[in-house]
Structure formats: C-alpha cells, structure tokens
Amino acid sequence: MASQGTKRSYEQMETDGERQNATEIRASVGRMIGGIGRFYIQMCTELKLSDYEGRLIQNSITIERMVLSAFDERRNKYLEEHPSAGKDPKKTGGPIYRRIDGKWMRELILYDKEEIRRIWRQANNGEDATAGLTHMMIWHSNLNDATYQRTRALVRTGMDPRMCSLMQGSTLPRRSGAAGAAVKGVGTMVMELIRMIKRGINDRNFWRGENGRRTRIAYERMCNILKGKFQTAAQRAMMDQVRESRNPGNAEIEDLIFLARSALILRGSVAHKSCLPACVYGPAVASGYDFEREGYSLVGIDPFRLLQNSQVYSLIRPNENPAHKSQLVWMACHSAAFEDLRVSSFIRGTRVVPRGKLSTRGVQIASNENMETMDSSTLELRSRYWAIRTRSGGNTNQQRASAGQISVQPTFSVQRNLPFERATIMAAFTGNTEGRTSDMRTEIIRMMESARPEDVSFQGRGVFELSDEKATSPIVPSFDMSNEGSYFFGDNAEEYDN
C-alpha cells in the first residue's frame, strides 16, 4: 500500500505509541503483556486459585471479562442511570472453576469494579493501560471468530452468509480503538455502516442536531477506516462516494454490499495478531520472564515460542474431543479463523479440520450446564513451524472453494495461491451497474474477472523453523490443493448470541 509511510505500525496502535523504532515497539508491547501477566497472577492470588486452576482457560476468560467490564465506562454509566433488578452496577464477576475432591465445581464470584480497577492499575505501573484491555478484547474476538458463524447477523444486514471470511472482529466492542479497527474485516466494517444507515432511514433525527453531528463524524470515520482496508483505487473511490453522501440511504447500502462482495476476490488489508489468554502471560511472568526487557511482538515468533512452553488446560464436556478443543483455541490464539486450512495445517503440523467436523462446542461453559460430568484436559497449542502474521490480503491480482465459505482472509504471510470460487462470486454481480457509481463498479468487476487464482500471493514468503527466530531461511510449503481449504465449509457452527 502506498500510504504505508504515514501509518503507525499495529504494535504502535496496540500501545498508543507515537512513532517508535522496532526496539521501542517491542519493549512497549512487552510492557503491555507483562502488565496483563502481573494482573493475572494477582487475581489468582486473590481468588486462591491453585496453579492448575490458574491455567484453566475458562477461569482466564472470567478474569479477563471482569477487568474489561470494570473499565467499560459507558456501560457502567448506563447501568447506574438505568438500575435493573438484581444487577449491582458497581460489581462484576463470573464463574470460577475449582477442583474439589476430584470434581470440578463452579463458584460464582462477585467483586467491586473499583477493586478490580485498583489491581489492574497496580499491575500496570498505576496506569489505565488501555492497550492491555484492547489486547484482551481482541483475544475474545478471535475466540468468537473461531467458534461461531455470523450467518444471522449477515442475513439481517442483507449480506450473504457465504461472505463469512470478511467478518473478522465482528464481536469487538466499539471501544476497542485503533488496534481494534485494524483487525476488523471488510464485512465487519460494512455491517457496522449498514446498521448505522438503517437507523438513519428509520429515525429522522438520527443525523440531526448536536447528536447528529457526532453521529456524522463517526460515520465518516468508519468510512475512512474501511476505505483504508481496500487496496484498489476503484474500491477506494466508491468509499469516498459512500462517505460524502448527503443523506445516506439504500443506494449507499447497495454500494457497501457490492464492495463487501468484491472483497472476496480483491481482498482488503486486515491485520492479524496472536493475542493469547491471560493464563499464558501470567505463568510466564511468574517464572521470571521479563517481557518488557526481552521485548515482544504479536506478529512474529514470540507468541509461537510462548505457546511452545505453556501449559493451558480446559474443561471438556462429556462428548467433546480434546484435540478438537485444542484446534479451536489454537486458531483463536493465532487469529486464524479465516485462514486457508491447508496453510494452518502445515504450520501447526497436525491436520486442521473444518468447523463442521469438530466435536466441540465453545470454550465457555453456560451457567446451566451440569458440572458433575465435566472433565479437564491439556490444550495442545504447540506448532511445527511459525510464520509472520500478515496485515494485507495478499496480492490482489488474484480453484475451488466451497458452498459454505467462498474465500479466505490470509492470516500468515505464506506463499500460496488464494482459492476462490469465481463463478459463485461473480454470479452475485449480475444486474445493477447503473447509478452514480457505475464506472467504479464496472472497473471493479473487470478487475475481478481478470483476477487469476493461480497467481501466487505473498511472493517468496514462507514458514520458518521454530529455531529460526530471525526468519532467515523461509520454507515454502507445498499444498495439496485437492483438500478443502475453508473452515466454515458446509457448516453447522453455533450462532454467536450476545
């Protein structure tokens, strides 16, 4: 992308940094990770968790959610102004699982938000450390991306459920800042914009008055974020049209859906980061590892190396397969929900199977589930190779894909040709090329028609041995192109419900 020079790196967004050099970035990301680790250790002490209980991913998620809720200012304010029955706006909590007499027991805990904020700040040199909070949000978002399909949400906004590869980050909260915006897929941004336009159509005051002015600024900002994800001039020009519209309505919704479809072939730039659960960072800090001094990167070898040496456990329901549970969490850790399964399999060193073939439900346990039959097992989160995470969609001058998911959004910068089902995608582009965006639409369709799946994306990038930390000798993997590449293929994943 031409504008690369003006952009802050994702690590800088992650740590609210101004321009920094690589060493400073590694140090500030390390500081953020260390803060999460220290906080987690302190929480385990407060809750008197054993080492095993502290490494249980379900306990980690509860603790992460508590601190995110404690700092959710908007919701806290709302809860105080609209008191609801049985909800104390000043408290936060969730299920903590303990091993008692050879059985797993659920205990619902409740803490003052003020107390949680104090522990968090104390672990982060007295600062609010928003970057660390965002990091945990992205981990939860990546876990949701690997666990659920967003079919219903896509259909509700008039999009096609087969566009699910564009939906990365669709469950990220609004307050996730620049780092959050960077990891959102094209479909996620389109969906947010469509929801906004629909509100404007239904509520005449939406764009009016002082509030309307703020709404308008938010709308234009979201348009610019989406525009920045596109890599071709015609797609960006269309985004300018959508942004400058006096009174956004159905024409803009049409344009946005058109752009989302076009992104299946002319892929957008979406960042990928390996965000790990707090129960990985905690024990590393406890063992004496100094993240700030050693430096850390979310897009290099560091997360792979950390997972090679980590022990994480998970509760397992009676008919779940622990290996499948491990795959789900591995994909979440590396933000690989929409990556080509062949690439993921090669890097992981064990076959990564489509979502529909997994015998596992989500990681979190509902409050009405029976604990009597719960078991626990070790999650296998190690990998055979590592690869650099990408922030682009691959070369856009782009074999078969499937009925479920008809494209991929690459996570790893690995040389391969990107599969897409041209006939399926192009079928969606019949008809409407008139109107004020006609020339751009025609241009985009022309580019898509001339795109060739055989063209290799990420020229010369490969995977690396775990001993090759400077990424000096790339291994370019060969893929069996007859295998199915998409994760949500012909799928029955559960829907994501708030």
UniProtKB/Swiss-Prot annotation:
Coiled coil: none annotated. Residues 1-21 are annotated as: Disordered. Residues 8-21 have a biased composition (Basic and acidic residues). Late in virus-infected cells, may be cleaved from a 56-kDa protein to a 53-kDa protein by a cellular caspase. This cleavage might be a marker for the onset of apoptosis in infected cells or have a specific function in virus host interaction. A motif (Unconventional nuclear localization signal) lies at residues 1-18. It is found in: Virion; Host nucleus. GO terms for biological process: symbiont entry into host cell; viral penetration into host nucleus. Keywords: Capsid protein, Helical capsid protein, Host nucleus, Host-virus interaction, Ribonucleoprotein, RNA-binding, Viral nucleoprotein, Viral penetration into host nucleus, Virion, Virus entry into host cell. The keyword RNA-binding applies. A motif (Bipartite nuclear localization signal) lies at residues 198-216. One of its GO terms (cellular component) is host cell nucleus. It comes from the Viruses. Pfam families: Flu_NP (PF00506). GO terms for molecular function: RNA binding; structural molecule activity. Belongs to the influenza viruses nucleoprotein family. South Carolina isolate has been sequenced from formalid fixed-lung tissues of a 21-year-old male which died in 1918 at Ft. Jackson, SC. Brevig Mission isolate has been sequenced from lung tissues of an Inuit woman buried in the permafrost in a gravesite near Brevig Mission, Alaska. This sample was recovered by John Hultin, retired pathologist. Homomultimerizes to form the nucleocapsid. May bind host exportin-1/XPO1. Binds to viral genomic RNA. Protein-RNA contacts are mediated by a combination of electrostatic interactions between positively charged residues and the phosphate backbone and planar interactions between aromatic side chains and bases. Encapsidates the negative strand viral RNA, protecting it from nucleases. The encapsidated genomic RNA is termed the ribonucleoprotein (RNP) and serves as template for transcription and replication. The RNP needs to be localized in the host nucleus to start an infectious cycle, but is too large to diffuse through the nuclear pore complex. NP comprises at least 2 nuclear localization signals that are responsible for the active RNP import into the nucleus through cellular importin alpha/beta pathway. This is Nucleoprotein.
